[in-house]
Amino acid sequence: HPHVSENGKFAVIHNGIIENYVELKEFLISQGVTFRSETDTEVVAQLLEFYYNECGDFFESVGRVLRRIEGAYALGMLCADCPDRIIAARKDAPLLLGFGEGCSFLASDATAIIRHTRDVVYMDDGEIAVLTRGGIQLYNAMQQPIEKEHHHIEWEVSAAEKGGYPHFMLKEIMEQPDALRHAIAPRLRGGEIVFDDLKLTPEKIRGFDRIFIVACGSSYHVGMVGKYNLEHLLRRNVEVALASEFRYSDPIVDDKTLVIIISQSGETLDTMAALREAKKRGAYILSIVNVVGSSIARESDDVLYTWAGPEIAVATTKAYSTQLAVLDMVGLCFAKILGTVKEEEYADAVRELALLPDKVKETLGHCEDIQKYAAQHFHHESVFFIGRNLDYALGLEGSL
């Protein structure tokens, strides 16, 4: 990236997959267009130039391209005849806009622009944005101008830096005590779990007769732990489903179903699709996500943030820990409302939650012991993680 059109008039950057690129490429070749690569992204650049030669208008050309392409995309498009602007578009791929003094930004994640601005807008599917130095104009799928809510990024620039650690994963492992404290402490008050940001009423909670936990990857493993805990606390059937399979399984979901969606980024494509399928069937959607203002957060009926800060390493650490904590708190909160947990068990669990950040900090203080065990085993080519019940889910996460 960027990919450039045949005559160099257009350049495109792209996250996602253009699913019908073969069909479009064959059409363009039949029109005499010469391709430089085998990528799906180049089709967008070539198609832009093809339509621009017909209509002579950058914005109109973008609209025509978007009506032809199928798949998931976050696009940034430039035209040599309009050097003062970038046009952006999204469908099923994260894209946000940053607003600065005399400058505008386009990124797939806030970590890319936090050094320059904290004022962002999250684009939704079908939207188009025109970026100039003077500002940004947003349009809906009908290409009508729209205004959207701005979000302020709360975390510090240092959260997206290594801070003296050799790599982000070690840094994020060591950040777990603080991340857990941020997720837990504001929600504990006078020995009670209090979700100020939860719209669910006790009456609504009592009305659910089925609970699904839906997620992908590590978040799915959190869901497996959640199934054990919630069934114990609520004495209700809880199903955990891989988001990629959920919408194809014809799930039994209706307006008495609570679907708990878990995602660190809030942009996981399969999880988004599962959310929309559940919502279409009438389910109430409660999401547990880390990224404020993300697509899953915006499309849910209710959202609980984990407030773990940016997680840059590929292998999850603090996001996983905070998801576990928040989901456990949800179970305890609901159990108190339903009357399915003894007062003593509830009080003990709340006390343990309050102590959890310090206990994790104490565990991470044994770095030399951890290093010793790692040195004994790191050279093995295969490892079996064996456990049952909660440890089975932990074993799956360890193997991942």
Regions found by a protein language model. Give the residues of each.
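Conserved beta-strand elements of the Class I
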Residues: 11, 87, 212, 258-260, ...
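Glycine-rich phosphate-binding loops that contact phosphosugars or nucleotide phosphates
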Residues: 206-355
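Short, basic, glycine/proline-bearing loop/turn elements
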Residues: 47-52, 258-263, 356-360
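Generic structural signal for well-ordered, non-membrane alpha-helical segments
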Residues: 17, 21, 37-41, 55-62, ...
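Short, well-ordered alpha-helix to beta-strand connector turns
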Residues: 7, 117, 208, 256, ...
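Conserved short alpha-helical segments that host acidic/polar catalytic motifs at enzyme active sites
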Residues: 1-166, 171, 175-210, 248, ...
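Flexible loop/turn segments at secondary-structure boundaries
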Residues: 20, 84-85, 95-96, 114, ...
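Active-site phosphate/pyrophosphate-binding segments
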Residues: 176-180, 184-212, 302-400
